[in-house]
């Protein structure tokens, strides 16, 4: 039976965190990131309020960078490693055997644990937003091209196969698996993935007896596409689509507000008659504002300001709901958090400005850019969410999250596909 790691105390966790902070802050890659972060603030003063509010939670830029890195450490190393142990203890004998044979096959100093953590980290794309995006992207392309469902599924399965082989290769490179143990180690890691898929997607993964590595990966990819498709479309129908629709309505109102705001500021007065500069939808929106202004006995310019503040707050609420209810599909919510921070600052900027003519130009310029980005994002939310996910080359995982030794001579993992 494999020994399972015991939970560590709070004090030990804090000591581990501090040690990791120190390691991260001394890393050249992180120093480069901190420098870029600081320069971004210097050259884009408008971003200061958003970034400063995030920094206040951890007091300094350095600690902020370290906190983000440590969050990554937990997300991309600790959690996947724990998932590996969960998969092992899930009740499948093949997974138990996998770790035992892995220890014999691989490995000295716990590098099988690292390999299992890395493969689950990279592979988690196939179980969360990235996998959903892969499937959805193929389905969406098929609709546009009129392709058959069979060819669409096949393309999605091939994409997931590529992810699996990439994850295996990354794990074995970092764990420095000896060449003569590649096949045995690959099968062990695939056993771990079988357990993770079975638990994560709640589907039965049949035993892989006397199958080649290529056959195992192909079968696993097929099961993943089926499982992710079911998960994805259920989430879409019952959670994501309704919230996303409300968010897009608020976004459209915000967009109309900015169009009207630009014209009012340019003319230095409220636009009374219909203008060629106003689309029908914006003109109708203007009439609604005028009716509300008359009802509450305020100037239409003031009503426009209040509407922008209110819409920003409502859009922020919808995005927060999307983040909470859609987290099992999207995974990391960094992009949503950043947008929510921006909307809160937008509301504050308009409150501080007092009237439409005192709003700073840079606030409006960034607002127009953000609205365009949000419109694109909410139009194809799940496909765009693939950009939030991590790739080995994006994370520089061996440089940032692991104190990995230099790579050994090149190994040909793919020769075992046949």
Curated annotation (Swiss-Prot):
One of its GO terms (cellular component) is lipid droplet. Keywords: Lipid droplet. It comes from the Eukaryota. The keyword Ion transport does not apply. InterPro entries: Perilipin (IPR004279). Disruption phenotype: Viable, and able to reproduce normally, but embryos contain large lipid droplets. Reduced body fat accumulation. Lipid droplets cluster in intestinal cells and contain a reduced amount of triglycerides. RNAi-mediated knockdown results in a reduced brood size. GO terms for biological process: embryo development ending in birth or egg hatching. Expressed in intestinal and epidermal cells. Expressed in the muscle and hypodermis. Residues 211-275 are annotated as: Required for lipid droplet localization. It is found in: Lipid droplet. Belongs to the perilipin family. Lipid droplet-associated protein which plays a role in lipid droplet clustering. This is Perilipin-1 homolog. It comes from Caenorhabditis elegans. The lineage of its organism: Eukaryota, Metazoa, Ecdysozoa, Nematoda, Chromadorea.
